[in-house]
Structure formats: C-alpha cells, structure tokens
Amino acid sequence: MRVVTVYTTNACARCRNAKALLVRRGIAYEEVNLAKDPDGRAELARRTGMVTFPQIVIGELTLGGLDDLLAADRDGRLGELLAA
C-alpha cells in the first residue's frame, strides 16, 4: 500500500474530517501539521503546488483536498490509488 500523507493545520475542520475518513477506512497516514512544522509549507508547495488545507498525497500523487478525498472514496478510486 502506498504512503498517505495528510498536510494539515490547527483549527481545521476539513482536516479533521479527512483524517476521520481515513481512520474509518483503516488507512494509515502520516500527518504533517504545518502549524508545528514551519518548513512544511515549502514542502507542501513543492509537492502539490497548493497551500490550502488539507492536502492529501498518496505516494507521489497529489489527490487534493477533502472534496477530492470524498469523491475518490465514493467512486472507488481511493482503494485503487492505494493499491497502485
């Protein structure tokens, strides 16, 4: 299974929702909390080109934010992306 990285910040309801969905699906993830990791913002911009939260990266693929995660979960792509 590919590594899932979730870029978050404090006081972010959409970040909490994304992490909760991953937990419900039994998907392990690494969290990069940019409120605690000031260098993480540059890494986020480099990896994804985005600076909004959350950002979900699966392996080297930037999935996107919460809406993208929900859509991938609904249409079955999430499992495919994890297995690829």
Features from the language model and the residues they span:
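Local sequence-structure signature of Cys/Sec-based thiol-disulfide redox active-site neighborhoods
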Residues: M1-A28
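Residue-level signal for short amphipathic helical patches enriched in basic/charged
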Residues: Y7-A13, V51, L69, D73
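Intrinsically disordered, low-complexity peptide-like regions
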Residues: T8, C15, E31, A35, ...
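Generic alpha-helical hydrophobic packing signal
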Residues: A18, I27-V32, D73, G79-L82
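Structural alpha/beta surface segment adjacent to cysteine/selenocysteine redox centers
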Residues: V23-E30, R41-F53, V57-L61, L66-D67
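Thioredoxin-like thiol-disulfide oxidoreductase module
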Residues: N33-V51, R77, L81-A84
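Non-catalytic, surface beta->alpha helical segment in thiol-disulfide oxidoreductase systems
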Residues: I58-A84
